[in-house]
């Protein structure tokens, strides 16, 4: 898992992989594009 210099703010986004990320920075750091704002139907990943 990569270490990302992301702010610790909770503004959930749903990634293209169907997972919820705490914020868009974390999603992008994991190589995932943002599908939509807000949570996906599944749990949050940090």
From Swiss-Prot:
Disulfide bond annotation, renumbered to this chain: 4-29, 6-25, 14-40
Record flagged with keyword Metal-binding: no
Gene Ontology terms, MF aspect: serine-type endopeptidase inhibitor activity
Gene3D superfamilies: 3.30.60.30
Domain Kazal-like positions: 1-42
SUPFAM superfamilies to which the protein is assigned, alphabetical: Kazal-type serine protease inhibitors (SSF100895)
Family annotation (InterPro entries): Kazal_dom, Kazal_dom_sf, Serpin
Superkingdom in the source lineage: Eukaryota
Keyword Lyase annotated: no
Site (Reactive bond (tryptase)): 8-9
Keyword terms, alphabetized: Disulfide bond, Protease inhibitor, Serine protease inhibitor
PANTHER family: GEO10195P1-RELATED, SERINE-TYPE ENDOPEPTIDASE INHIBITOR
Function noted in UniProt: Acts as an inhibitor of human tryptase, trypsin and chymotrypsin. Probably acts to block host defense mechanisms.
Name of the protein this chain belongs to: Leech-derived tryptase inhibitor C
Organism encoding this protein: Hirudo medicinalis
Lineage: Eukaryota, Metazoa, Spiralia, Lophotrochozoa, Annelida
